[in-house]
Amino acid sequence: VTYRAEYIWTDGTEPTAEVRSKTRVLADGDEPGIWGFDGSSTNQAEGSDSDVVLKPVYTCPDPLRGGNDIMVMCETFLPETMEPHPTNMRAKTRAILDKYGDQDFWFGLEQ
């Protein structure tokens, strides 16, 4: 038995990033792991060196497909170093929250 994992990330479109996704079919019991995509088609890389890594950070049931299918929220990383991709806004936000987590925040996050 298989299920579908819909990997979701934000691309490099400016001035406002767009949501991208691609589907991976996994065997029952397999966890969604690190995957990749061609960043030249998402404004995240040049065509000659276009690999970008998708790293899952959160999964939830897929409300659109139902069943055992899931949505996989991802961050993007550079394949050579596994450092956050320049378009990875979640990594930048996490760094700020890690640094100032003991403070009271007076702002909201939107997606």
What are these regions (language model features)?
Residues 1-111:
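ATP/Mg2+-dependent ligation/transfer catalytic cores
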